[in-house]
Amino acid sequence: MKKLLSLILTAIMLVSCTLCYAEETPPAKPDGEMVQGTPPEMPIGEMPEGMGTPPEKPDGEMGNGMGMPPEKPDGEMPGNMPGGMPGGMQGVPTEYDSVYTVTEDTEFSGELESTGKDENLIHVTSGTAQISDAVITRESADSTGGDTSSFYGVGAAVLANGGTAVIENSTISTDAAGGAGVFAYGDGIAYVSDTTITTEQNTAGGIHVAGGGTLYAKNLNVTTNGESAAAIRSDRGSGTMVVDGGVYTSNGVGSPAVYVTADISIHDADLNATGSEALCMEGLNTVRLFDCDLSGAMQDLDQNDNTWTVIVYQSMSGDSEIGKGHFEMTGGTLESTNGGLFYTTNTESEFILNNVSITVCEDSEYFLRVTGNANQRGWGSTGNNGADCTFTGIAQLMEGDVQWDSISALDMYIADGSHLVGAVINDESCAGNGGDGYCSLYIDEDSSWTVTGDSWMTNLSCEGIITDVDGKSVTIANADGTVIVQGESEYTITVDNYSETCDMTNAGNVSAWENYAVEF
């Protein structure tokens, strides 16, 4: 009897263990199915359906494609995820709606109108569209704008994405979201001359390239009034723009006069932003300004840790390839009505200024800022998002402080009769735990620095003159207080290394407009 009871108890225990195991360990599900609320691993670049926005990743990276792309400066819309589809997962359109689709040489003139949702008035896929003495109107209250307009030209008045558009002596007006004036994409080429372009709504640039498109402009009058609607605009996939003469005005918030994710050369043009920074560049791209008048009026926004006039940065949105952004300005004027002047963060960058007349606001925060950032839109991770910058002034007056931090690298060349008036300040407010960055200042024999406050830098090489505003010599010392050069001024320049000789080998050189000008 005892033996029988023992067998029964053993059987009961085995059944109980089996049930417990079944409750704690559910059976494996087929690949891709959800298991008791625990999602399977997703391929890189995909987002599980129904999931919210996870925390941002450090160093500007997206969390395996699961985060939302950071926004662009001063109100620009978010761009694409790196290497993938545009924000919203929209791909290249397989077809476009248009009033006129051009597949062979065609001429247009007179009044031309488009009122459809997200449609182009003229879409050139092959051949040449010759548009002369035309009055073009594009209006639609239903158009959506957004990424497909910014990246591919959906809804633009004139789109060339396979053929050539030649526009002259015409007027283009759009009042539709995403209603760019003229857009060149891919193999498309646009020539636009002696034409007035006005756009009213968001993501409606004046002249626009993306995806490798090419656009040449001469003597245009362009005005944009929406947000994220630069008068001269480029976006994902880069491209080439050459602009000669004209007036370009952007009136919207987040609408610089020039938005650069392409190779852009501009000559003898008025470039005005009334509610935004003057110029914004992202990633491995280039802008050259020759004898232009550039102005900006950026607003102070809570999401930004400072206010600027020209920015070179990397948002990690995927709108531009990561690499060195190149800003070059020869002659002309630069005016800032609010904030600092030049700002670079979370990227490599090069600035070259050659004899530009600069006007800054009375309370300008800086001439040049090369630091990390704590921007709320996620341009890298604070403490790991500094800049690597080379700045060259040629025959250039530069008034204002130079700010740098230890997670950045700055080589600043003051050359050929240039004059810096300001202090060099080590600002660690966005540097986290700091790093091994540096600031090196090079002053050639024809140049000078007027020091307006105590200054700190890693390396100072000077063959020129350093004084304060009263003409007094300035003390140069090591961090431990060891005096290298005894001065009479109240100010001290603190350095790790000091040299009375300058190596200007890596200073920037200016380009010539003639190398980029196109006659048409």
Residue ranges and their predicted role:
Residues 102-110, 128-134, 165-170, 189-195, ...:
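All-beta strand scaffolds that present successive hydrophobic residues in beta-strands
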Residues 125-201, 208-217, 221:
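Post-signal-peptide, soluble extracytosolic/periplasmic N-terminal scaffold domains
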